Amino acid sequence: MADKKTIGIYKAYLKEHLSKKRYTHSMNVANSAVELAKRYGADADKAYVAGLLHDVAKEIPALELAAIVSKSSLDVCDIEKKAVPLFHGIAGAELVQTLFDIHDPEIISAIRYHTVACGNMPKLSQIVYLADLI
């Protein structure tokens, strides 16, 4: 999936835009996601990227998040548009597409839904959801 240089770009962005605590959390989620992916037969490279970037939008101010969500190319329902705690997942899924040109549907889904479980979650989404909890 992503080479070391690309991963370095992701990490540099996160270091610049997240608190040290949030960055460490993102690294831990990425590593846990890899272990879960190996155990449950998912793509470990995708798990690492999705885990690393799952909170890319976590520390963006609420008004900015709302603007990203309102302009999102993703299918966002009315309930989601009113649920501020969900904004960082939706905005994060949007941002990785625009900032990093990531368009893999599994990665986008895993980032978008990492805060809430949804019906028929793809395996990678389940993995990142769980990795974020442990």
Predicted regions and their residues:
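Divalent metal-dependent catalytic cores for phosphoryl transfer on phosphate-bearing substrates
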Residues: I9-H17, V34-I134
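N-terminal glycine-rich anion-binding loops that anchor highly charged ligand groups
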Residues: T24-H25
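Non-catalytic interface/linker regions that flank or bridge core catalytic/transmembrane domains
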Residues: M1-K4
